[in-house]
């Protein structure tokens, strides 16, 4: 199993003819799905404060690879991008410039102020963190967010039938060496944070 850090530093964010290795492996890039996938990405905006604020945290920002993702920070003064891939951070800098603040390191090793962020976004990230560190990560996200500010986490439901089907197709479509760490807690695990 390849480490997440190695995958994204070596291959994941490299440009391909279509998009990126990450997108080719894990996203639906069919032309027929383009409009639907774009709408899914934009649904995140429904949870981001319309009046924005000073700081939004993009945890595991990647290169901010889609235009829809740029809209997340349009009403914020600064977008703080955290990712341990230098390739991702360099690409994010090209897109955001001085509107961003960039951290190329392990999130748990960054000392953010408590109650600092007006909004937090984490897309498809938490389940790639070792299961023993997922709760610590969520608690830190809560700690550094302002009271009553949204923490938007896109996770995976381990109990859906579609996950079983996806596993079959994933095994058929991809070489095993590209398999990345993935662990989803049961839905009731999330209750500890309410």
Residue ranges and their predicted role:
Residues 59:
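Conserved beta-strand/loop positions that form the S-adenosyl-L-methionine
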Residues 1-53, 62-100, 104-111, 152-194:
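Class I (Rossmann-like) S-adenosyl-L-methionine-dependent methyltransferase catalytic domain
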Residues 135-147:
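A short glycine-rich, Lys/Arg-flanked "PGG" loop and its adjoining helix->strand segment in the class I
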Residues 121:
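A conserved beta-strand element that flanks and buttresses the S-adenosyl-L-methionine
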Residues 53, 117-118:
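Local beta-strand N-terminus motif with an aromatic residue
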Residues 124-128:
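Short catalytic micro-motifs in class I SAM-dependent methyltransferases
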């Amino acid at each position: 199993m390849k480490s997440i850090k190695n995958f994204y530093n070596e291959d994941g964010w490299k440009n391909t003819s279509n998009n990126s290795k990450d997108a080719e492996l894990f996203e639906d890039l069919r032309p027929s799905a383009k409009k639907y996938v774009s709408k899914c990405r934009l649904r995140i905006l429904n949870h981001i404060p319309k009046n924005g604020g000073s700081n939004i945290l993009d945890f595991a920002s990647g290169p901010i690879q889609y235009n829809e993702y740029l809209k997340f920070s349009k009403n914020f003064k600064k977008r703080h991008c955290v990712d341990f891939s230098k390739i991702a951070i360099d690409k994010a800098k090209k897109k955001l410039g001085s509107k961003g603040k960039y951290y190329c390191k392990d999130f748990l090793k960054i000392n953010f102020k408590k109650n600092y962020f007006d909004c937090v976004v984490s897309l498809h990230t938490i389940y790639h963190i070792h299961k023993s560190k997922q709760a610590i990560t969520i608690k830190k996200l809560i700690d550094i967010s302002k009271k009553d500010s949204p923490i938007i986490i896109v996770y995976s439901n381990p109990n859906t039938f579609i996950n079983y089907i996806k596993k079959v197709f994933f095994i058929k479509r991809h070489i095993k060496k590209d398999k990345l760490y993935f662990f989803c807690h049961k839905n009731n695990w999330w209750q500890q944070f309410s």
